[in-house]
Amino acid sequence: MLLLHGFPTAGHMFRDLIPQLADRFRLFAPDLPGFGQSDMPAPSAFTYTFENIANIIDRFVEVIGLHHFAIYVFDYGAPVGFRLAVRHPDRLTAIISQNGNAYEEGLSDGWNPIRAYWQEPSLPNREALRSFLAPETTHGQCTHGVPDVTAISPDGYWLDNFYLARPGADEIQLDLFGDYKSNVALYPTFQNYFRTHRPRFLAVWGKNDPFFLPGGAEAFRRDIPGAIIHFFDTGHFALETHAKEIAAAIRDFLAR
C-alpha cells in the first residue's frame, strides 16, 4: 500500500496507522518532494507543481517495484495518487481516501483566499496566504473539529512546523497553493476514471474538516456506486484521533 500524505505534514502522519496494518500489508509512506525528509530543491531548480510531484512518485513506485498496490491518499496526496490511478488503472487494487477530494462540492469556503490567488496570482494575493504557514494555523488545523483536543499528540504539529520553518519552505508551499488549481481542473478527469474503472473505494473522512467537506466524500458514490463511506467525529487530520478505527475499516474493506 502506498500512503500519500498532505499539507503541511509528511510520512510521519501515518505513524499510528502503520503499526496497525504492518502485519498484513507492505506499507510505503514517502515524503513528497519539498516535505519532511525528502529533498527540498529551490524553486529555481525544481518547479513545484502537483504534476511534477506525481511524476516523481510515479518513478519512486517504479524503482521500488510496486506493480499492483492500493493507495491511501490524504489532502495533497489525493491529486498525486489520482494522477497515478489515471495513468496506471491496471496497477491499482484499491483506493482509500482520507479527506482526499476530487469534487467541487468538497471544497469549503476556507479555500476562498487561495481561490483569490488562482483568479489573480498577484503578489498581494500570494502574501495573503502566508498566514496558512503560521505555527498557530498548523495547530488549529490539527485541533479544529476535534471534540477532545487532549487526544492529539503534539509531536505531529510540532514536527510539521519544524519543516515549515526551514529556509525556503514558505515559497515552495505558496507555489503549491497556487498550483492546486491544476488539481481542480483535473476533477473531471479523475471522475471519468472513477466512472470508467469503478475501483474498489473506501472513504474515511473527518466530518468536521474545515477545508474538505463531507459532500466531497459522498460525491464519490456518484461515480463509484459501490464506494464505502465512513465519517468520523473529528477534523482534517483524522488519523490523529481515529487511527485505530480507520485501521479497522481498512482491514475490513480490503478483506472483502
Feature annotation, model-predicted:
Residues 7, 101, 237:
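Active-site pre-Tyr helix/loop in NAD(P)-dependent dehydrogenases
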Residues 1-37:
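Conserved HGGG/HGGXW glycine-rich cap/lid loop of the alpha/beta-hydrolase fold
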